[in-house]
């Protein structure tokens, strides 16, 4: 009888062991997880100080979130965040600085798919451009590094970035698709002193499609935006001050010389050389089509209000027809020139190479009226 009770008790205990959940202190052995799933787990990395750039560049593919905190990038070195893993999130904190050296740059490079780059509220990328500024920009003098290469980005976002005192051009956007940039600030106002800063373009765009830039504030000494090639580009709700306004081109002389379906909307252009400009290269080929400027306000333009030139690189020559400008729309454009030294509207087209233009609600005052416009399209006038 005792043996039977012991046997029954043992059987019940065995069943209980099988049915009971595993003891947390002694977990049950489970099948090893798939290696690919482990690789996808979130890893947060923080890099800072003088070794931060080097460590970030070496370890970037091990991190899904990268914090760059008060990084001091050594001279002649790129903060290289190219070829990031899909979905990587990059966050700037504090002040990012760059050592001095005469070289072409860039100071920062980012590429990848589904990338997010952003700055925290106190973050600043400080180029300390006065160390390079000599009044010559990229045309001579010291060799100056370009600032930020947003090249080969796909389905990505750059937001809330504050850049101060770039040595020369700021954002180069090239080979990118479906890139959104919001709340970008470039403050190069220190370069206005003695006209020392030059060629400090805010956004240079080439060979890219579906680029959207909104909420930008650009204070610089060259084009706020220059679209050299690309399609489906949208720039809106922004301020451009002190530079060369909203530009298409120069178009011509590159591997890709097509600009198509571009919209500038709701932009204020202040104290700039001109507000609206299309520039194509004499003797070259390409095309500019479906470009719209809508709801643009500008004040105190110094050289031109609106300027279209098909001989941009040599205005002494008769404009050529190799880069036609078609389907060009200006709608609700209101602005002022600083004084009579500013030409309100200037158009220099090749014979028959500017067509299908529609201008409505365009008003430019305070400057002089040009008598030298060439081949003005039907329905358009240089005397508004």
Curated annotation (Swiss-Prot):
Cellular component per GO, a single term: extracellular region
Sugar attachment sites are 261
The Swiss-Prot or TrEMBL record annotates one GO molecular function as: polygalacturonase activity
**First-tier enzyme category under EC:** hydrolase
Where along the chain is the active site annotated? 222 (proton donor), 244
Q: Which SMART domains does the annotation name?
A: PbH1
Catalyzed reactions: (1,4-alpha-D-galacturonosyl)n+m + H2O = (1,4-alpha-D-galacturonosyl)n + (1,4-alpha-D-galacturonosyl)m
Instruction: Give compartment(s).
Output: Secreted
The family annotation for this protein states: Belongs to the glycosyl hydrolase 28 family.
The protein's matches in PANTHER family, at most eight in alphabetical order, are given as: POLYGALACTURONASE
- Relate the protein's function as given in its record: Involved in maceration and soft-rotting of plant tissue. Hydrolyzes the 1,4-alpha glycosidic bonds of de-esterified pectate in the smooth region of the plant cell wall.
Q: What is this protein called?
A: Probable endopolygalacturonase C
